[in-house]
Amino acid sequence: TLGVEGEIDAKVVKMNYGGGVKLGGGWGSGKTTFLNALSDYIPKDERIITIEDNAELQIKGVSNLVRLEARNANLEGEGAVTIRDLIKSALRMRPDRIIVGEVRGDETVDMISSAMLNGHSGSMSTGHANNPMDMLHRLETMMLMGIELPLIAIQQQIASALDVIIHLGRLRDKSRKVLEITEVLGYENGRIQLQTLYKFQEEGMEDGKIKGTLMKENEITQREKLLAAGYSETGIHGGSG
């Protein structure tokens, strides 16, 4: 498991109803596993479209689910269907949200600019990164691969599209953990502003396994999105919502 059951404030999960979520981490850190777990909180009446290179996502309990898979070119170099092609097609299929297994190139433009900023704000994807700030830098680079815009415009789009970055890692004992959950506050003073909500604190070893806790560091500040997700004012300020 990823060792997070019962440790994450329900407010973070509830933001998944309407917030853009990006999962980051290295190879084998559990990004796809956690994305599957996060998808359990998607309202069951939504229309979901998943897009992958190879089918790995296991979205359960959603009746209106469309799975799209990329395809390599044939021996003649024809017939390829890319992740970017599929995102563009998915946008015409009237989804409530789009879930992309991994973005790694110019398709980031369509995921950020077209999907997350145009009525599909609960969309999610994964990507390789060393920490939340590194994830932002990689997203900037990938968007620059696909569109000619000033960096400031790209940063503003990313800041508007994303609400939460969840960073996962594989520790030296081979366990996989959520290491940090970060809120994207917006664009200000020439940069994307972040706030750490939770951070994994290592507490030692027991029977060869790393023990630790995902410690809460700050409250979510995006009050309007929590209200839109169904939280009451009491819930935002510490109640159960």
What does each of the following model-derived ranges do?
Residues G30:
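Conserved glycine(s) of the Walker
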Residues G24-W27:
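P-loop (Walker A) phosphate-binding loop of NTP-binding proteins
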Residues T33:
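Conserved structured catalytic cores and adjacent interaction surfaces
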Residues I8-K11, G235:
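Intrinsically disordered, low-complexity segments enriched in serine/threonine/proline/glycine
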Residues E52, I59-V62, A90-N189:
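Conserved P-loop NTPase nucleotide-binding/switch module
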Residues N36-K88, M135-L139:
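P-loop NTPase switch/communication element
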Residues K174-G241:
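NTP-binding/hydrolysis catalytic cores, primarily Walker-type P-loop NTPases
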